[in-house]
């Protein structure tokens, strides 16, 4: 008995001695980690000029060498109620939560997949039909290939699916119309391929809707519950959730988006469309109407500090503090350039050529990766410079520039702030 007890103690001590302790974020002055503070401070005036010109708000956080060196908010979380400018707009703070839009794909869906791959619960070369049996070729399909679709094809956006079938808009979706999650899965199975899988690259929301369903199939949990309980909670994240208004948050904590629901200032109509200013609900139509606010492609809300922790997990090679989600091999696997398109890894956008300059600027290393979100969000992770940048914004919280010409271009989208690369370059240009 004594021998067993001693052996157990020694084994416990041995395991604890080899336990991985990952770096955690601390605060440092820019000068301490190689920035010229005076140059970096110039960014303050440039961003404020964009706010004065009409950009709703920008929240910015910069990480360098495991330190937060800049965290600041500019502008307004809510300045409009419909078309009316508020007499007392709500200022954005560094705690303001934002609709991440397509950054959901990385910090919910990809994080979940990276964890499941590391745990051996899924292989990216598995067939999609292993987890969603109904994804298969049908006799009347003009383009076939669903039978052989692999998860890696979905992640590389070469699976053949259209970019945006607009399931909740019956006028566009036709027979694929859906405004319920269970029906949406069936409509995805029926969605025709637009091209032969592997023959070209089309960035598709459908791909990540499918990945969300696959995660739910493997974990037997809703996507939001899985990521919130197994990823965000262990990391100590307090403001990273789907459907925040259902989880204890209030509108004043969140940045508002489109002024007139999803109508693009009154030119788009479909059953159940929202018409009031969106405030605390996901903007994305498929995520809200077709998926109940929780989807693999959109729906996540967060603030800059929580996003900084998630980016630091990637810089650390898969963990934070005493929490390990995956390993450095998994990070390398998911951020490796796709053979079909050098600007994509497994889901991650990669700084693979000059086409990514509007996103990552001209000064970030070629190994930089991250993602953007339609609402005005950017994450940029540079493992060479051990640096990361998160920009959160609410770009659609402004009038549509010309609804009849292009309902998807907002006044704020015409400003330089809508192109993240110039902000990224100002930050890199401040390095000594």
UniProtKB/Swiss-Prot annotation:
Cellular localisation: Cell inner membrane
Main location: membrane
UniProt KW keywords: Carboxypeptidase, Cell inner membrane, Cell membrane, Hydrolase, Membrane, Protease, Transmembrane, Transmembrane helix
Source organism superkingdom: Bacteria
Gene Ontology MF term list: serine-type D-Ala-D-Ala carboxypeptidase activity
Tagged with keyword Hydrolase: yes
Matches recorded under InterPro entries: Beta-lactam-related, Beta-lactam/transpept-like, Diverse_Enzym_Activities, Pept_S12_YfeW/YbbE-like
Keyword Protein transport attributed: no
Transmembrane segments: 7-25
Annotated NCBIfam families: PRK03642.1
Catalytic activity: Preferential cleavage: (Ac)2-L-Lys-D-Ala-|-D-Ala. Also transpeptidation of peptidyl-alanyl moieties that are N-acyl substituents of D-alanine
This protein's name: Putative D-alanyl-D-alanine carboxypeptidase
Alphabetized HAMAP family for the sequence: S12_YfeW
GO cellular component: plasma membrane
EC id: 3.4.16.4
Protein family according to the UniProt entry: Belongs to the peptidase S12 family. YfeW subfamily.
Gene name in the database record: yfeW
């Amino acid at each position: 008995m004594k021998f067993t007890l001693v052996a157990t103690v020694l084994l416990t001590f041995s395991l604890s001695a080899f336990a991985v302790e990952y770096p955690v974020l601390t605060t440092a002055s820019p000068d301490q980690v190689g920035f010229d503070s005076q140059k970096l401070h110039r960014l303050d005036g440039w961003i404020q000029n964009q706010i004065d010109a009409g950009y709703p708000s920008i929240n910015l956080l910069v990480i360098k060498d495991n330190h937060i060196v800049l965290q600041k908010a500019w502008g307004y979380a809510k300045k409009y109620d419909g078309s009316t400018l508020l007499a007392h707009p709500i200022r954005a703070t560094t705690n303001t939560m934002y609709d991440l839009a397509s950054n959901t794909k990385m910090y919910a869906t990809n994080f979940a997949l990276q964890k499941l791959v590391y745990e051996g619960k899924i292989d990216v070369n598995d067939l999609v039909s292993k987890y969603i049996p109904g994804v298969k070729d049908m006799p009347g399909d003009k383009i076939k290939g669903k039978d052989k679709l692999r998860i890696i094809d979905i992640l590389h956006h070469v699976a053949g699916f259209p970019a945006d079938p607009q399931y909740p808009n019956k006028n566009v979706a036709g027979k694929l119309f859906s405004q319920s999650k269970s029906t949406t899965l069936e409509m995805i199975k029926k969605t025709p391929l637009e091209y032969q899988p592997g023959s070209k690259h089309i960035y598709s929301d459908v791909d990540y809707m499918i990945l969300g369903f696959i995660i739910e199939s493997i974990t037997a949990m809703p996507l939001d519950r899985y990521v919130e309980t197994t990823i965000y909670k262990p990391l100590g994240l307090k403001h990273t959730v789907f459907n925040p208004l259902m989880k204890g948050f209030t509108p004043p904590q969140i940045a508002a988006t489109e002024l007139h629901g999803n109508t693009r200032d009154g030119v788009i109509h479909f059953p159940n469309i929202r018409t009031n200013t969106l405030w605390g609900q996901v903007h994305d139509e498929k995520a809200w109407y077709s998926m109940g606010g929780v989807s693999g492609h959109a729906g996540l809300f967060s603030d800059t500090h929580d996003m900084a922790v998630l980016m630091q997990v990637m810089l650390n090679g898969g963990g934070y503090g005493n929490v390990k989600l995956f390993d450095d091999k998994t990070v390398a696997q998911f951020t490796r350039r796709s053979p079909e398109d050098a600007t994509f890894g497994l889901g991650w956008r990669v700084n693979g050529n000059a086409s990514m300059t509007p996103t990552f600027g001209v000064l970030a290393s070629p190994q930089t990766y991250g993602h953007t979100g339609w609402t005005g969000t950017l994450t940029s992770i540079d493992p060479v410079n051990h640096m990361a940048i998160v920009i959160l914004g609410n770009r659609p919280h402004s009038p549509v520039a010309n609804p009849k010409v292009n309902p998807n271009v907002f006044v704020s989208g015409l400003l330089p702030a809508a192109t993240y690369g110039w902000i990224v370059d100002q930050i890199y240009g401040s390095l000594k």
